[in-house]
Amino acid sequence: MFGFLFKKIFGSKNDRYLRRLRSQVQSINALEPQMQELADEDFAARILQYKKAVQEDGQSLDALLPEVFALVREASRRVLGMRHYDMQLIGGMVLHKGKIAEMKTGEGKTLVATLPVVLNALSGKGVHVVTVNDYLAKRDAAWMGQLYGFLGLSTGVIVHGLDDDERKQQYESDITYGTNNEFGFDYLRDNMKFYGHQLVQRGHNYAIVDEVDSILIDEARTPLIISGASDESVGMYRIVDEVVCKLRPEHYTVDEKARTAMLTDEGVAYCEEMLKLDNLFDPANITAQHHVLQSLKAHQVFKRDVDYIVQDDQVVIVDEFTGRLMAGRRYSDGLHQALEAKEGVTIAAENQTLASITFQNYFRLYDKLSGMTGTADTEAVEFHQIYNLEVISIPPNRPMQRKDYPDLIYRSRQEKFDAIVEAITELHKNRQPVLVGTISIETSEMLSHRLSKLGVPHNVLNAKQHEKEAEIVAQAGQPGKVTIATNMAGRGTDIVLGEGVVDLGGLHILGTERHESRRIDNQLRGRSGRQGDPGSSRFYLSLEDDLMRLFGSDRIKGLMEKLGLRDGEAIENAMVTRAVEGAQKRVEAHHFEVRKTLLDYDNVMNQQREVIYALRRELMVEEDLDPVMDEFMNDVLDDVYSTLDGVPVDDHNGLREAAFARLRDVFNLDRVLPENAHLPEREECEPLIRKVLEELRSETGDSYRDIQRYFMLEELDRCWKEHLRNMDALRDGIGLRGYGQRDPKLEYKREGFEMFQAMLFQIRENVFRALSRVRVAPAETAPVEAIEIAPETEEAQGQPLAREYRHKEDRGQLSYSGGGNAEDARNTPAKAAPRIGRNDPCPCGSGRKYKKCCGADK
């Protein structure tokens, strides 16, 4: 009661925050006459002046906000013909403060972003504007780039297909547009490079995420993964698929809520008989068991034209939230191969994770993060808990006039779609445009087929027809237009009403099914009623819809039975609408827990990732790596000699002998020790190791530092890749610890830490084991063919190329032997040295590019 009165008198927290910002709006407006007097060439000069004040004089961005916002508003009026409204100024301030601005469709979010973008670009550290697809990134960069260019700021855009040099150039711009995937993958690829000059990103200063709910919430369950092909055979998938596709309903059970499928006892017996196995769950048959369960999931849980489509001999995932194709993305853990076997297309090799990060942890790298969307309030708690982002709702510039009608609920899907087709036909006759939202490609194509039979012209927009997406969406407001869109693809493109449509009631939104998330439904509704335009919306549901069937209340079904509704009749009741929203809240809570659990587990990996990437960055950019080598050496020596504490000289258990053997193996001490040598004391061992390294330094000359860097990075990458695989395996089975009354998350954290510590130690030992065995052989007697290490997947483009090391003046070439004698060398695979890139620094030490120096004649 008290809280209600407090809000009534003083307003909500949101209202009070907006009131504080309005005083700054007055300051900005007061500067408008002054800005209008400036000549065009004065704008860029002003920006340079502000840059100097921030970068050299230490002036805060907050102090410059009124002047910069006023300058940008006037520049926008001159260049784009658009002047920022007061509410757009407030939206810009909210973004600058590192919060999420919730602004309804048509309120000009793209223009709002220019205000904080210019202000934060003054620091010279770069600003990233994150969009949901390449089309919007290119469109906004070209459109708003006119304004930034007028102000003397450079604009870049990161899209698929750019090489590293082009990407680096775009990131050097003051403002860089791109998709969340491109930014995330560039970060991962940067942490797989070998040299500091190969890095494309220059830090994570400030990001504005457009459609922030789509990127930070909807896609948070899908980690970014760079993977390479593993050595697993794919033949088993076909064999298992032939068995699983013959299973009968009594052989398995399906949990649609959890999206899982399990074999019954009859199913297990059938699979054992068909695969000729004694016990499917025997540890020796763990691979076969995994294949069977993934194939069962592919057949019974995943649906064609809903979860994926088949295109060009490939299984392509469909984004469940946007309806767009996710080209290049693959399900992990063998599920994608099971789907390929199910559909009879070519089965690609299984992948092994080389690098991964979730969007949650990627975007938390930024010093300041903000976002814009039309629908964030329903997820405000999650934004606050996971990203520490506050959601501020910005009132529309003009009052909303859209009418949102109550849902209509039918008993069956057939009755529902009959009513939908009838409603579309009636609206088309009246020339009122209608946008029909579906949640699957299957539904959109079924509706399209029925409308075609009735002779109703229409456009279909789904993952199969996405090339003209923006054009189709932009035309959806013309008189008589019928547009069918899957999961509201086309966000970011305004639907402008055609001539006379306002008098017809504006754009009508017709939802064929409620989505699991209220926010997605609100996004669909938000396509109508922009900038105070009239509009309307209504959802059509049935008791057979997935949401109603899995999460809906039995009360609705009971009510419909009591009312004795006849075929084709619908129930329209506020209680029903509330019950549907209650079902959606339960689903949202479930998905929130899934995302939070994913983050809890990824936080363990994130801490480890930060340590590895920091070490990797140091190895890439530091000129002198000897201090790191000294640290590695002392860590190994401390560990070896700590095992001998209290062990007598006349050790009968062989501990001293084992320690000596380990030292000789790791540091290749046989290279400098006399025959019949015994374990040296701790202080005597260090000079021996330095002697081994000094011999290598004298043999390799100026190439020593490159060789040193190469082996350190190579061992770090190899061990990290293996560690990722081990952590995946640990994660897969950790849930079983719950049966032993142990917390799986704590167990994962503890064991993951132990595995990480062991990996770090393995890196230290392997670096010395490899480096101490390098030999320089005469070039004419031991030619080494230069090769390029090709990435296995498209996502892995930009992986480092290993180096070809030549002795100074080309007197010799590197070889790597695996031990101290010829027998060891014969049994160890040789490491071929890849070629030098033409734009890389010349290894002769001149400081010039290879193509301008020793490679000029090649």
Swiss-Prot record:
Membrane topology: Peripheral membrane protein
Domain of life: Bacteria
Record region (Disordered): 808-848
Cofactor: binding comment: May bind 1 zinc ion per subunit.
Cellular compartment(s): Cell inner membrane; Cytoplasm
Sequence positions that bind ATP: Q88, G106, E107, G108, K109, T110, D494
Ribosomal protein found in the keyword field: no
GO molecular function: ATP binding; metal ion binding; protein-exporting ATPase activity
GO CC annotation terms, alphabetical: cell envelope Sec protein transport complex; cytosol; plasma membrane
Binding-site residues, Zn(2+): C842, C844, C853, C854
PROSITE patterns in the cross-refs: SECA (PS01312), SECA_MOTOR_DEAD (PS51196)
Cofactor entry: Zn(2+)
A Pfam cross-reference name: P-loop_SecA
Coiled-coil regions listed in the entry: none
Top-level EC class: translocase
GO biological process annotation, one example: intracellular protein transmembrane transport
Enzyme Commission code: 7.4.2.8
Keywords assigned by UniProt, alphabetized: ATP-binding, Cell inner membrane, Cell membrane, Cytoplasm, Membrane, Metal-binding, Nucleotide-binding, Protein transport, Translocase, Translocation, Transport, Zinc
Catalytic activities: ATP + H2O + cellular proteinSide 1 = ADP + phosphate + cellular proteinSide 2
Keyword Transferase: no
Self-association and partners: Monomer and homodimer. Part of the essential Sec protein translocation apparatus which comprises SecA, SecYEG and auxiliary proteins SecDF-YajC and YidC.
Role description: Part of the Sec protein translocase complex. Interacts with the SecYEG preprotein conducting channel. Has a central role in coupling the hydrolysis of ATP to the transfer of proteins into and across the cell membrane, serving as an ATP-driven molecular motor driving the stepwise translocation of polypeptide chains across the membrane.
PANTHER family tied to this protein: CHLOROPLAST PROTEIN-TRANSPORTING ATPASE, SECA INNER MEMBRANE COMPONENT OF SEC PROTEIN SECRETION SYSTEM
Family: Belongs to the SecA family.
Protein name: Protein translocase subunit SecA
Species whose genome carries this gene: Desulfovibrio desulfuricans (strain ATCC 27774 / DSM 6949 / MB)
Gene: secA
